[in-house]
Amino acid sequence: MARPRLQFLGLMPWVQQTAIRGNMRATLSRPGQLADLVADRLGGRGAFRQLVVSSRGRMLRAFQAEEPSEGGRVRLRRDAAYESFLTFDALLAQGSTPDAAALRDDLDELLRSSLLTRGFMLNCGECRTVQFTPIERVGRTYPCTRCGALNSLTGDRWHRAGSEPEFYYDLHPAMRTILKDSGDLTLLLGNRLARLAEEYSDLAEVEFAEEGAGKPSFEIDLIAHRDGDLVIGECKEGDLGGGQTRQQLIAKRLDAAELLRADRIVFGTALPEWPTGDQDAVRTLASSRGIKAQIDFIADLRRH
C-alpha cells in the first residue's frame, strides 16, 4: 500500500496521525522510551539492532548472571534488585569475544556510548556498604552512595583486591531492563525483517489508548516500514498462552493491524518453532474478521 505521507512525516509521526484518525493516541511505552534512549546513545535503531547480534551484545548478557558472586564478578543489591558487575578478566572468560584485544575494542566502544561505566568496588568505612563507584567519582577520597560519608581511598576500602583494586564494569540501567524484559527480541525480529530489504525503519513498544482513557488499549512490540509495506510485530519468549488470554492477545494485534492498515503481521518467538495451535488460532481469528494482511510466524529469534 502506497503511503507517501509516511515517507514525508517519518514513522512515529505517521503512526500518531493515523491513531488520531481512529480516535486514539499513540505514544512510546516505558520500554519503548528505554529502547529509544539506548538507540540514541548508539546512533540510531539500526546501530542498536546490530549491537544485539554482535560480540558486544553477547558480552552484555554476562551482566544478567544471577549466580552468587565469584571470581571477577560481584553481585550487589542496588535499588530493588541484585545486579552483577564484572572485571575485564571475568568478561573475557565468558567467551563472547575471541581474545583480549577484541574485548578491549568492544569495551572502548561501549564506554564511548556510555552503555558501560568503568569503576571500582569499594566499601564504606562507616556503614560498611560495598558499592560500585564510577571512576570519575574517585580521587583521594570518595563519597558513600548510601550514607554520604567521605572515605579515603586506602587499601582497607578495596573490595576483594590484592595489591591494587581492579576495574569493574557496570551496565546502563536502561540496557539492564531491556535485557531482563526480553526487549532484545524486538531488535532481533527487526533484523530478520530488515534482511534483503532495500528500505527499512522501525519503532519498538508503542502503546495505543482511546482518547480520554486512563490506560492503553493495547501495545505493539514492533512497527516497521519495509519496502513500502507497513508491518506490525509481536515478540514472545514462549508461545501466545492459551484460552481466553491467547484470544484477547490475538484480537488486540488484529485491532492494531486494522487501525494502521498493516500489510503484514509477524509473530516472533525465541522458541525453536511456533506451536501449531498458536498459528491456527491467529489465522482462524484473522479470517473470521476479514483481515487481509499477510500473517507470518518467525521462530528461534536468538539464532543468528
Identify what each model region corresponds to.
Residues 1-304:
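Intrinsically disordered, low-complexity Ser/Thr/Pro/Gly-rich regulatory segments
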